[in-house]
UniProtKB/Swiss-Prot annotation:
GO biological process, one term: translation
Provenance organism: Myxococcus xanthus (strain DK1622)
NCBIfam families membership: rpmI_bact
Name this polypeptide is given: Large ribosomal subunit protein bL35
Pfam families reported in the protein's UniProt record: Ribosomal_L35p
Keywords linked to the UniProt accession: Ribonucleoprotein, Ribosomal protein
Length: 68
């Protein structure tokens, strides 16, 4: 049986940690300063976040056949 391939789009967007958490970049931050946003929303878009447990299970199961 051939090897299962990891989705290359998921490789670029997610990082699976040893604890099983899935780290991701925040959305809506690419054109951060091109239009008016509140300082609070700019601060909250910095850095990375983690997916919720149910979403993380789906991502790992569907996108990473060998668990990331």
């Amino acid at each position: 049986m051939p090897k299962l391939k990891t989705r290359s789009s998921a490789k670029k967007r997610f990082d699976v940690k040893k604890s099983g958490k899935v780290k991701h970049g925040k959305a809506f931050a690419k054109h951060l300063f091109t239009f008016s946003k509140t300082p609070k929303s700019k601060r909250s878009n910095r850095g990375t976040g983690h997916l919720r447990d149910m979403d993380a299970k789906k991502v790992i199961k569907e996108m990473f056949p060998y668990g990331g």
